[in-house]
Amino acid sequence: MIPVLICVLISLSAADNDLDTLYPELEHSRTIYVTENGPQLSVMAEQSKVVSRRGGNATLPCKIQRDQSLAPNRKMRIKWTKLTSDYLKEVDVFVVMDYHKRSYGSFHGRVHLQGSSPMDASLVITEITLEDYGRYKCEVIDGLEDGTVVVSLDLEGVIFPYYPRLGRYNLNFYDAVRACHDQDAIVASFDQLYDAWRGGMDWCNAGWLNDGTVQYPITNPREPCGGKNTVPGIRNYGLRDKDKNHYDVFCFTSHYKGRFYYLIHPSKLTYDEAVRACQKDGAEIAKVGQMYAAWKLLGYDRCDAGWLADGSVRYPISSPRRRCSPTEAAVRFSGFPDKKHKLYGVYCFKGNN
């Protein structure tokens, strides 16, 4: 092996000599090592996810580390944006530079920097709404130096499948957004559906998610739901046409400020009578999302079927018992009966002013 290596080295040396003879004007190349200082400014977050609830406050961490060799710069710019679910664009939230500050859109008057030190760019969000859920980017620009970090704002809440009176698979994506909004909810994210599936959610009807995909969670594989011999998981139809394709939707809601209750009334009610009865009690007929929030987050339990705002009849069971969801805790669904039927009570909601 050594003689072979010596021969190779001799051959390479001879080749170099031949080049020198043939091209005397050719300069020998030299390897130049360039050293570069590391970034003089960096941005970091102590935690990548913050959990809060609707109506609460949250602080999204963003700390600046700045090289001492950098000259003081009063023009450092801090900008917070919210990333859309498909990451295709950013929504302005808050910008500050020197003494100039500005908040945008629905965040106006609800956001400010924590400012515990000159190097603290953490964002405080107050009176959190359902729409605040998502990922936020903190961007710091200091002269030619810049840095970014992304922090998620998660909400305590509950996910629920939904379809309207028209029946299953009647919602395009934009209809789905409106349907969830009408029920005091937003279209759920994949992360929220995944968490619900891990918690035991099993639902065999495909529904829209906020990224434009259509999926459904299966914990008990069976033939009509992706196949009996498949593993549990979230079945994924992928991205669908938001205008042309029609499915159900998975909605998400969180804590509310107010009181959800079953109205004690001397007789059963038609839908219109139910609406008026809640109004007479200083409330409004409750929405599906409010029932799910009361059931999941507050343990509300009532074995009386009652009208809700969308014309459906449901009742929430937290303690399974005979004749009241004997096998599991759930919001039981009695369908969309004729609104003239005088067969049900009503659930009302009274918000806190």
What are these regions (language model features)?
Residues 108-151:
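Ligand-binding face of N-terminal immunoglobulin V-set domains in extracellular IgSF glycoproteins
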Residues 68-108, 191-192, 289:
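N-terminal V-set
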Residues 2, 6-43, 159-160:
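N-terminal signal peptide
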Residues 27-30, 68-76, 139-157, 252:
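Extracellular/luminal immunoglobulin-like beta-sandwich modules
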